């Protein structure tokens, strides 16, 4: 099977896993938003940001270092495994110590215990991360997708059950711990077919390149995490837990799901791009195809949601959350802009150029934090959303000059087309939904479904009749894949 078909087949399995996680995550958010009080939901929202941080730091970029290197020895794998274990213990201790300072800064004393409980992930997760990386490297996403979907399902069930019984934010922590534990146990069992780590005294210089790559990747992830999640602690400190719940509810609808849809493609594309990292022209063509595909998926979903946001919030979360509608609409636009620049990380990892992203993220922190802080003080939760939108516009613009141009050369036309052309394809749907929203002002489930069907139908028709070459190629590839399946 060619790399192209293998990549698309892997994308199918990765999509199934990611969509399962997105659907379960959305259901969990809807259920908990209805059974928890706004204050408890606010505490839970803060912990969700903590979960993202622990997921990001759990292997300190070592997994992607394994994927990035074309040929890696068993001794190098074993050395990286034990480095991961020791780093996990170190991060566990540091998190326990810092938990009190974090809870004090956010003015929520109860956070310290929940953060300490979450820190157990640093002890658990490293035991399975390497096997996960090896499966990704070989594009074996069928097995990996089943493991991740099952693990997330068990965590979802526990979270909802404890939430219904206790009506306490701690339910999410216990569910998260079960998800991580279940995934690690299964990965450790299944992954033994690749190799069994051995204890062998290795010289760090033997894995120096991987450690350096991991360092840049981790530093970049931390800086990127600060840029994308700093709004939550700012809102918590300035406005309080209830507004954190409202902001993060909007954020989890408009920004998080699309950010999980993009990795459906980028997660598979990183190993694929790594295999062609030395062919610059082929790399450029495939990367911009990726940007187009992501825009074709995200633009209609987010811009459509922006128009029917009031109906969505009332029907899904209930009347008590209607105050988040303006915030949700702004974050939908911000989410669409964010997705345009999001896949660049895969390109930089494939080329082992993470130092470019690190420098860029330093620049973004200097710009973003003041913008977000003062916009929140200026206009509360809506101001925070406006600040985030401004930051994403800056990010989309500067990404070309700081990241794309140094790696791919002068490609400004390709970059603009990667979001302008998909936006043009979305316009008929947007215009029709605006007309529907004007003439159908009554909120009901029937009218809500009708708007979705009309908007979705118009967009699918637009894609179907479009003469765009990339769309024709993608339709042909997926048709070929379905026939082979």
From Swiss-Prot:
Residue spans crossing the bilayer: 13-33, 38-58, 79-99, 111-131, 160-180, 211-231, 234-254, 297-317, 321-341, 365-385, 388-408, 420-440, 445-465
Keyword terms: Cell membrane, Exopolysaccharide synthesis, Membrane, Transmembrane, Transmembrane helix
Cellular localisation: Cell membrane
UniProt membrane topology term: Multi-pass membrane protein
A matching Pfam family: Polysacc_synt_3
GO biological process: polysaccharide biosynthetic process
CDD domains: MATE_tuaB_like (cd13127)
Name this protein carries in UniProt: Uncharacterized membrane protein in cps region
Species the sequence originates in: Klebsiella pneumoniae
Organism classification: Bacteria, Pseudomonadati, Pseudomonadota, Gammaproteobacteria, Enterobacterales
């Amino acid at each position: 099977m060619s790399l192209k078909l293998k990549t698309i087949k892997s994308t199918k399995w990765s999509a199934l896993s990611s969509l399962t996680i997105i659907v379960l995550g959305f259901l969990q958010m809807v259920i908990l938003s209805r059974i928890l009080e706004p204050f408890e939901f606010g505490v839970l929202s803060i912990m969700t940001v903590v979960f993202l941080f622990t997921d990001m730091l759990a292997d300190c970029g070592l997994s992607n270092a394994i994927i990035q290197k074309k040929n890696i020895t068993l001794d190098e794998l074993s050395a990286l495994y034990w480095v991961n274990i020791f780093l996990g213990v170190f991060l566990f201790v540091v998190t326990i110590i810092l938990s009190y300072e974090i809870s004090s800064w956010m003015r929520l004393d109860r956070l310290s215990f929940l953060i300490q409980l979450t820190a157990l992930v640093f002890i658990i997760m490293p035991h399975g991360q390497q096997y996960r990386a090896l499966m990704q490297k070989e594009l074996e996403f069928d097995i990996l997708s089943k493991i991740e979907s099952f693990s997330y399902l068990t965590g979802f069930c526990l979270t909802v059950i404890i939430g219904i019984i206790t009506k306490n934010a701690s339910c999410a922590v216990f569910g998260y711990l079960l998800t991580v534990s279940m995934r690690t146990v299964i990965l450790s069992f299944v992954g033994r077919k690749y190799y069994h780590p051995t204890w062998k005294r290795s010289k760090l210089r033997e894995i120096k390149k991987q450690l350096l790559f991991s360092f840049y990747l981790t530093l970049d992830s931390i800086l990127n995490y600060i840029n994308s999640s700093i709004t939550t602690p700012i809102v918590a400190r300035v406005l309080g837990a209830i507004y954190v719940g409202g902001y993060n509810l909007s954020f989890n609808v408009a920004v998080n799901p699309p950010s999980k849809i993009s990795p459906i493609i980028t997660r598979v594309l990183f190993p694929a791009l790594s295999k062609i990292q030395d062919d610059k022209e082929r790399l450029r063509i495939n990367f911009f195809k990726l940007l187009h595909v992501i825009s074709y998926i995200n633009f209609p979903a987010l811009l459509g949601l922006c128009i029917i946001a009031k109906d969505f919030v009332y029907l899904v979360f209930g009347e008590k959350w209607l105050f988040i509608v303006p915030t949700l609409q702004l974050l939908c636009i911000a989410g669409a802009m964010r997705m345009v620049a999001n896949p660049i990380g895969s390109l930089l990892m494939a080329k082992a150029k993470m130092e470019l992203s690190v420098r860029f993220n330093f620049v973004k922190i200097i710009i973003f934090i003041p913008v977000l802080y003062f916009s929140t003080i200026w206009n509360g939760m809506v101001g925070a959303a406006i600040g985030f939108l401004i930051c994403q516009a800056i990010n989309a613009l500067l990404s070309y000059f700081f990241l794309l141009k140094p790696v791919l050369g002068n490609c400004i036309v390709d970059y603009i087309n990667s979001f302008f052309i998909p936006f043009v394809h979305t316009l008929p749907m947007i215009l029709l939904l605006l007309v529907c929203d004007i003439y159908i002002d009554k909120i009901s489930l029937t009218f809500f479904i009708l708007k979705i069907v009309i908007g979705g139908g118009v967009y699918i028709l637009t894609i179907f009749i479009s003469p765009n070459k990339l769309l024709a190629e993608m339709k042909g590839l997926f048709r070929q894949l379905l026939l082979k399946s």
